[in-house]
Curated annotation (Swiss-Prot):
SUPFAM superfamilies, per the entry: Protein kinase-like (PK-like)
Residues engaged in binding ATP: 45-53, 69
GO MF terms held by the record: ATP binding; cyclin-dependent protein serine/threonine kinase activity; metal ion binding; protein serine kinase activity; RNA polymerase II CTD heptapeptide repeat kinase activity
Stated name of the protein: Serine/threonine-protein kinase ssn3
Gene responsible for this protein: ssn3
Species of the source: Emericella nidulans (strain FGSC A4 / ATCC 38163 / CBS 112.46 / NRRL 194 / M139)
């Protein structure tokens, strides 16, 4: 039974209406408004190829804390070329202006000032990468099983909302899963998100590289030109595993594109998956023979000695070792991931995207049905405290910050990540 703290999802896949939506539909562009007139800039959070992110508080009676994402115009050398915004920036603004769900980051407004775009979001104090990192210091101690369950449920709840509205996220990873101080999960950074309802061209033709390498689904690694919301569910499986083990389950090295922008076969990442999940074959993934990189997979299998490549899945032993080393009970009981947790993980990490569990099916899984109510506050019952985001005050001039343009190069955008967390990830 699901807790009453979750009024958003019902058993038939719909969403209960709320008396007070978090904002009016169509929140969007605000003209003739200056950022500093509405917001006091507290300090600098992080930066990337898109621009910079600052923490702010509202002025003139507008309460609350905000994260202001400043997009920079494209630059060529020292000359700024006002050539418009990147596709990713336009998508993020368009989608965030329409989406409204408790488990998706909330956009307050968009401001245009001096040919710069500012996206004003609600402020979130934590993200999953910070939380995972906290549990590795000074020595490893597990994230409580009840917290993992709440995090995963809220994440899937937000993902169901996105998929129901024909939105693929395409960059789910711990750094992009935000957590408020009250323990609410928000899916953030929709810079790579896009609508997938009747696309005019294949999704591959628009963005040849999607999803950070450690969380990239096997169909993407195998060069699939057409993919589905299943790519987001694989990433959720990777995040679930990382919450339990406190380290990425498939930590491969990314092969970079050559000068001709040819997407290479990610051999090392595929091997990391095979080491745990076994070699994919027609029995567990019938469509694999039609994948563009299938010959590369065959070559990879033949290049390794027969006893040096796993033909069957080792996920079960990985999971048991994870529970044992993490201090969880290996038996299925209240407060531990147990057998239900393994079944959900294995269905999220199904090689075949056509049989991989959906967000709706996952929310109805026994892992959530059994074990009592799920709190909408993932910190409920947790006696420890997580450190706040690192905010620097020596670089808080939102008007003068100078960085590259809005265009992404690969997948660098950990927009609300602290500097320390970025260094840890690298």
């Amino acid at each position: 039974m699901l807790g009453r703290n979750f009024p958003y999802f019902n058993s038939v896949g719909g969403f209960y209406s709320r008396e007070n939506s978090r904002r009016q539909p169509g929140t969007g562009y605000t003209s003739k408004v200056r950022v500093r007139d509405k917001y006091h800039i507290v300090g600098f959070i992080s930066s990337g190829t898109y621009g910079r992110v600052y923490k702010a508080v509202g002025r003139n009676g507008q309460g609350g804390e905000f994260a202001i994402k400043k997009f920079k115009p494209d630059k060529e050398g020292d000359i700024i070329q006002y050539t418009g915004l990147s596709q990713s920036a336009i998508r993020e603004m368009a989608l965030c202006s329409e989406l409204d769900h408790a488990n998706v980051v909330q956009l307050a407004e968009i401001i245009l000032e001096d040919k710069c775009i500012f996206m004003v979001f609600e402020y979130t104090e934590h993200d999953l990468l910070q939380i995972i990192h906290h549990h590795t210091q000074p020595q490893r101690h597990p994230i409580p099983a009840a917290m993992v369950r709440s995090i995963l449920f809220q994440l899937l709840n937000g993902l169901l909302y996105l998929h129901t509205n024909w939105v693929l996220h395409r960059d789910l990873k711990p750094a992009n899963i935000l957590v408020t101080s009250s323990g609410a999960i928000r899916i953030g950074d929709l810079g790579l998100a896009r609508l997938f309802y009747k696309p005019l061209n294949s999704l591959f033709s628009g963005d040849k590289v999607v999803v950070t390498i450690w969380y990239r689904a096997p169909e993407l690694l195998m060069g699939s030109r057409h993919y589905t919301p299943a790519v987001d569910l694989w990433a959720v499986g990777c995040i679930f595993a990382e919450l339990l083990s406190l380290r990425p389950i498939f930590k491969g090295e990314e092969a970079k594109m050559d000068s001709k922008k040819t997407v290479p076969f990610q051999r090392n990442q595929m091997m990391k998956i095979i080491d745990i999940m076994g070699l994919p074959h027609r029995d567990n993934w019938p469509g694999i023979v039609h994948m563009p990189e299938y010959s590369q997979l065959q070559s990879l299998a033949m290049s390794r000695a027969p006893n040096h490549i796993s033909r069957t899945s080792n996920l079960g032993s990985w999971y048991q070792n994870c529970l044992k080393n993490g201090g969880y009970s290996v038996n299925s009981s209240v407060g531990t991931p147990g057998d239900d947790g393994f079944d959900l993980l294995s269905r999220l990490l199904d090689y075949d995207p056509t049989s991989r569990i959906t967000a709706k099916e996952a929310l109805e899984h026994p892992y959530f049905k059994n074990g009592g109510p799920i709190s909408a506050n993932c910190f409920e019952g947790f006696e420890g405290k997580y450190p706040h985001r690192r905010i620097t005050h020596d670089d808080n001039d939102i008007r003068s910050g100078s960085l590259p343009g809005t265009k992404r190069s690969g997948l660098p955008d950990d927009s609300l990540m602290s500097r320390a967390a970025k260094r840890m990830k690298e």
